[in-house]
């Protein structure tokens, strides 16, 4: 068997109240893609931070190119040939693409001046390799989130590293961008680069990876060859049990209409009409840029409605701010939980109650007892894994952060719950828990809009599905009559025969 270029053996790391790593192991082989799998909180990110010197490990050994090493920080590991593409962007919007790629490593002449033309040329070559249709002189802030992620990847490639760690690299990418990334990964593999690929998207793991390492509760569970394992076995290794049904949809008798839109238009949205019943899950499908998030923000009041009308519980509303949306009984859980949904420097309690302070106050005084009681109730209900309600939320796993974001919306006691990519970056075990919670809200008569780029999720959880294309509704289906081919056809603007049951 090929000798590993990078070996992590018996790594241990503890934080107050929790042992994050307990004998974790990982081998990275030259010319191979190693998937690093595990539920949120399994220790994947902690292991990578221990490798690159962000965290000092408590025990264990790291060997790189056959020698024991102990990196004292990301700069040290990067200079040694190990690059990491973080899930959170580490870029500056006010700088150009080229400046971001070569920040701190600018090419200079004998007099200390920057060789701009050479730097732009090298940056353009990296962008071309990733099929990014922008010039490196363009400001980064003008790019979409997915395009910025491609710049982050270009930055990692610029180091010409021997090992590249990719943490959820396709999380914000379109299908086309993902294809471009996979093409580059295959090229890097052929060049002998060792790649660590961290993702919750099982389809990607089986498509692009050679081997799989699984962590659970900070422990090393096993290393397998991708060709020798199936999804069910992999999931069982990750969660320690078999998941009987991935999408536990329930049938609930729908109530009267709760939300109606009439020819609503706004930024990126054109003449959209639909209705939503109580006890119904309405799925919204479509490609990135189709206007799904923009439509949700118009309903919530985060974007302006330029024409049309919205009726909530038979009353016309015109939300012009998120405060209006909350006052009307609409809760919106953003697709960007770290940018819009949560304040990472605040505690679990503060994040969960931040939108419900009016309901939790007596006059002008916050009722701290009521706040603590409500927060503790949701921590138990959602099975949120946190040492205490006062834990800084940025220290929680992605799945637990997402549960807090959903709980924050539910504490406002909404009539309509909008979930925009609720399971993005969430592991299979936490997904199942979120689906069960969604079903519980549905059974209680709540109206739910589920926006998701994962077609199996939309098909598996929704009662009815709308498809958007270029800001318009391009298709409507009862979930039982839909499939991925129909949704994708509508998503790209093709005409598809649609079967929709009309409710009175």
Swiss-Prot record:
Report the subcellular localization: Cell inner membrane
What Gene Ontology cellular component terms go with this record?
plasma membrane
Main localization is: membrane
Q: Which GO molecular function entries does the Swiss-Prot or TrEMBL record give?
A: ABC-type D-ribose transporter activity; ATP binding; ATP hydrolysis activity
Database matches in SUPFAM superfamilies: P-loop containing nucleoside triphosphate hydrolases
Q: Which SMART domains match?
A: AAA
Under the heading PROSITE patterns, the entry gives: ABC_TRANSPORTER_1 (PS00211), ABC_TRANSPORTER_2 (PS50893), RBSA (PS51254)
Q: In the UniProt record, does the keyword Repeat occur? A: yes
User: What is the enzyme's main class?
Assistant: translocase
**Which reaction does this chain catalyze?**
D-ribose(out) + ATP + H2O = D-ribose(in) + ADP + phosphate + H(+)
> What's the protein's topology in the membrane?
Peripheral membrane protein
**What are the EC numbers?**
7.5.2.7
Q: Which residues form the ABC transporter domain?
A: 6-242, 250-495
List the InterPro entries. Answer: AAA+_ATPase (IPR003593), ABC_carbohydrate_import_ATPase (IPR050107), ABC_transporter-like_ATP-bd (IPR003439), ABC_transporter-like_CS (IPR017871), P-loop_NTPase (IPR027417)
- Sorted UniProt keywords: ATP-binding, Cell inner membrane, Cell membrane, Membrane, Nucleotide-binding, Repeat, Sugar transport, Translocase, Transport
Which residues hold ATP? Answer: 38-45
Q: How does it assemble?
A: The complex is composed of an ATP-binding protein (RbsA), two transmembrane proteins (RbsC) and a solute-binding protein (RbsB).
Q: Which family does it belong to?
A: Belongs to the ABC transporter superfamily. Ribose importer (TC 3.A.1.2.1) family.
- Cited NCBIfam families: PRK10762.1 (NF008030)
Functional summary from the UniProt entry:
Part of the ABC transporter complex RbsABC involved in ribose import. Responsible for energy coupling to the transport system.
Output this protein's name.
Answer: Ribose import ATP-binding protein RbsA
State the organism's lineage. Answer: Bacteria, Pseudomonadati, Pseudomonadota, Gammaproteobacteria, Vibrionales
Q: Which gene encodes it?
A: rbsA
